[in-house]
């Protein structure tokens, strides 16, 4: 296999105008890989450390130190290593960093290299990235969990739930699912506009109208689905990212004007899934409420997918604890939460081995990088969350999945309802 010849890096900006790290990897056979690192708005306290410069430049969010770490330290460490030995490469970087949360070199530095090396190795092998990572069995296209209405930390809409998503589960192909999602999205804009509400967009391309409750937001989406000509729950299901750690203060959930316990929030969710065809709820409880998660999973885990984002932070150790305690039943996969590809692979493998579902995910601060689209297919996630069908940094991932579906041809399978076997008819 080709050897790593040179690693370079630079500071670029993401979709929110904040700096991030982009890495170039050149192999000795001329193969080249480039990757850019995403960044989140609502971040879990247990995530790998994103190294920022501080100071006045870019209001403290510069990443020149992370870039320097790639160019001066990581490049020297990985020079001459075989590019297809991803596990060794990631381990060498973790050893070089020497901290549990990658705070010395920065997870943004390490991840940029990890992804760029994989891209270069795929090019050297003359394979698309999804095939290089996933092998011959990578053929399942994920259900797009499209965030078409934004709240919480992603918008100034007044509603506490961070993301209201649609899942086109009734489609036959990914391309059809994307069309369904786009048609509902455009219809939602008209529904919102006709009610005299704002059609401004949040960080992830979803609309951010001023609504006063979760149910009011869901009602807008249900109306849009029906007016677009689709059946709610049959053609298109609903999903939520509550991001509850964002409104958890002083031991209580400050939700929709009240202060609630974990037990009371469980009743809120139980009522919602009875009233609406919701197949997935992400981060329903605070990220360290293990007891609450176990109780919630026992209560409604057979009726709805309960996804750990801030709860698991794509970390195999936290996921293993969740499996042991029967807390949640699905893993959200964000490569920058853990900081290397192989640790991401390990988390997804652990989830699937124990009957947990997985959902590949973007971050609110994104770039044109499409790595997660390939990984969703390579790791057989069956679900992907990468925003609304709007804003080029979101659409880039959907368009890459269209290309992958085209490459696969007759071998392509769209996950559809099978992504939620317990929760759909």
Swiss-Prot record:
(2R)-2-phosphoglycerate binds at residues 162, 334, 363-364, 385. GO terms for molecular function: magnesium ion binding; phosphopyruvate hydratase activity. Disulfide bonds: none annotated. The active site is at residues 204, 334. It is an enzyme of class 4 (lyase). Keywords: Cytoplasm, Glycolysis, Lyase, Magnesium, Metal-binding, Secreted. It catalyses: (2R)-2-phosphoglycerate = phosphoenolpyruvate + H2O. Its cofactor is Mg(2+). Binds a second Mg(2+) ion via substrate during catalysis. Its main location: cytoplasm. The keyword Disulfide bond does not apply. Catalyzes the reversible conversion of 2-phosphoglycerate (2-PG) into phosphoenolpyruvate (PEP). It is essential for the degradation of carbohydrates via glycolysis. Belongs to the enolase family. PANTHER family: ENOLASE. HAMAP family: Enolase. This is Enolase. The lineage of its organism: Bacteria, Bacillati, Actinomycetota, Actinomycetes, Mycobacteriales. The gene is eno.
């Amino acid at each position: 296999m080709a050897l790593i010849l040179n690693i370079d890096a630079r500071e670029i900006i993401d979709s929110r105008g904040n700096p991030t790290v982009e890495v170039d990897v050149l192999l000795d056979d001329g193969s080249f890989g480039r990757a850019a690192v995403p960044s989140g708005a609502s971040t879990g306290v247990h995530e790998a450390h994103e190294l920022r410069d501080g100071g006045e430049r870019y209001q403290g969010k510069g990443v020149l130190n992370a870039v320097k770490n790639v160019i001066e330290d990581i490049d020297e460490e990985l020079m001459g290593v075989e590019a297809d030995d991803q596990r060794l490469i990631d381990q060498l970087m973790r050893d070089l960093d020497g901290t549990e949360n990658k705070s010395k070199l920065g997870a943004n530095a390490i991840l940029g290299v990890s992804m760029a090396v994989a891209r270069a190795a795929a090019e050297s092998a003359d394979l698309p990235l999804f095939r290089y990572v996933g092998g011959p069995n990578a053929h399942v296209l994920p259900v797009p969990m499209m965030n078409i209405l934004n709240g919480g930390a992603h918008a100034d809409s007044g509603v506490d739930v961070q993301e209201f998503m649609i899942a086109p589960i009734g489609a036959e192909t990914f391309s059809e699912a994307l069309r369904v999602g786009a048609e509902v999205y455009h219809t939602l804009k008209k529904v919102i506009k006709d009610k005299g509400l704002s059609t401004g967009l949040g960080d992830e391309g979803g609309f951010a109208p001023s609504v006063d409750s979760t149910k009011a937001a869901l009602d807008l989406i249900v109306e849009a689905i029906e007016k677009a000509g689709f059946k709610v729950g049959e053609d298109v299901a609903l999903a939520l990212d509550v991001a509850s750690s964002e409104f958890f203060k002083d031991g209580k959930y400050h939700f929709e004007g009240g202060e609630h316990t974990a037990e009371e929030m469980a009743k809120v969710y139980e009522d919602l899934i009875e009233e609406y065809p919701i197949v997935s709820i992400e981060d329903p409880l605070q990220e360290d409420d293990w007891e609450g998660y176990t109780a919630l999973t026992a209560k409604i885990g057979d009726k709805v997918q309960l996804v750990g984002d801030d709860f698991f932070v794509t970390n195999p150790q936290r996921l293993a604890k969740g499996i042991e305690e029967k807390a949640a039943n699905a893993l959200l996969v964000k490569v920058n939460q853990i900081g290397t590809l192989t640790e991401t692979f390990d988390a997804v493998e652990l989830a699937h081995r124990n009957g947990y579902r997985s959902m590949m995910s973007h971050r609110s601060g994104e770039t044109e990088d499409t790595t997660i689209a390939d990984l969703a297919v390579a790791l057989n996630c069956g679900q992907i969350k990468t925003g609304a069908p709007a804003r080029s940094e979101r659409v880039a991932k959907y368009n890459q999945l269209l290309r992958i579906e085209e490459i696969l041809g007759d071998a392509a399978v769209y996950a559809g309802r099978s992504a939620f076997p317990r929760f759909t008819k």
